[in-house]
């Protein structure tokens, strides 16, 4: 299937989604908000990839929401009715945009973002929903909505405050300043900084291969447990992992890879099964 704003390939268990509108700084046009969750949810449903890498062509990862959205009434919401019923309808419109990125967080496979140049506005909503983020040394990050008189509403605030120290989340949000890659790594937004796009993509793909080489059920379970633990107490997290393993731990599935590793052989793991609909959809 083809998409307007990105290309998608799958090889050796690694899905690679490349934003492909470099001439427009990979801005997010209306079709992006439909196509991204469609593509990610399809990967998650059919279990065709063990990991998803997201990168971008051109100088910038993404400049966020396309300018047409702001200049052609895209933020005005539904027409007709009183202010109150329009506001209620706009809430659903906003939540649909939020779902376009929440699908990354809810996907059965890990999602790795490789970022160069600008990651501003809606792109911050985008990358904070990914599992891990990597950047080139020229990359910068900005909650730019504040500078245009808007409170970011598609996911930045609830996720950013759980990724970096609260003081930095507040400073970035209040000032709309640019935080460059080295500082972003220092505060925990970025895992690693690379000298060039080529080095970054090679490095992220190497990490993706490591992930793809592990048991899909264990990796998917780890993602689920980390997401749950982030949003719950330690006691809740311990209880959930105990229930999870009580139902999904397979002794034979562990013994076989263990024995293969002991013999210096490459372990083989059972793939996740395709499903009609994932829990996050």
What feature does the model see in each segment?
Residues 1-3, 258-281:
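Terminal low-complexity tails and localization/encapsulation signals of metabolic enzymes
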Residues 102-217:
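Crotonase-fold acyl-CoA enzyme core
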Residues 1-57:
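Conserved CoA-thioester-binding segment of acyl-CoA-metabolizing enzymes
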Residues 58-63, 120-121, 226:
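Short, active-site-adjacent cap segments at secondary-structure transitions
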Residues 17, 21, 36, 54, ...:
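Terminal peptide-recognition signature
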Residues 31-35, 96, 103, 203, ...:
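Charged catalytic carboxylate motif
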Residues 134-139, 190-239, 247-250, 269-280:
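C-terminal long alpha-helix characteristic of the crotonase
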Residues 56-99, 149:
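Glycine- (often His-adjacent) and acidic-residue-rich active-site loop
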């Amino acid at each position: 299937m083809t998409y307007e704003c990105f290309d998608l390939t799958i090889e050796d268990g690694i899905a690679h989604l490349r934003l492909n509108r470099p001439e427009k700084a990979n801005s997010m046009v209306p079709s992006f908000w439909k196509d991204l969750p469609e593509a990610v949810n399809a990967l998650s449903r059919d279990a065709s990839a063990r990991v998803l890498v997201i990168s971008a062509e051109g100088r910038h990862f993404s400049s966020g929401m396309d300018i047409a959205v702001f200049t052609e009434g895209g933020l005005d919401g539904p027409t007709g009715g009183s202010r109150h019923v329009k506001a209620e309808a706009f809430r659903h419109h906003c939540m649909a945009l939020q779902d376009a990125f929440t699908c990354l967080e809810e996907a059965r496979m890990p999602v790795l973002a490789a970022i160069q140049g600008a990651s501003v506005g809606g792109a911050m909503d985008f990358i904070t929903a990914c599992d891990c983020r990597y950047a080139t040394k020229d990359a910068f990050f900005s909650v730019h909505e504040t500078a245009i008189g808007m409170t970011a509403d598609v996911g930045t605030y609830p996720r950013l405050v759980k990724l970096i120290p609260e003081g930095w989340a507040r400073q970035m949000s209040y000032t709309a300043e640019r935080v460059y890659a080295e500082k972003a790594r220092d505060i925990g937004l970025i895992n690693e900084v690379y000298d060039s796009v080529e080095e970054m993509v090679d490095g992220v793909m190497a990490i993706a291969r490591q992930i793809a080489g592990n048991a899909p059920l264990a990796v998917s379970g780890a993602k689920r447990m980390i997401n749950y633990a982030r949003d719950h107490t330690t006691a809740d997290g311990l209880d959930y992992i105990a229930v999870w393993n009580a139902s999904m731990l397979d002794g034979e599935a562990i013994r076989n890879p263990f024995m293969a590793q002991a013999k210096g052989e490459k372990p083989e793991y059972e793939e996740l099964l395709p499903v009609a609909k994932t829990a996050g959809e």
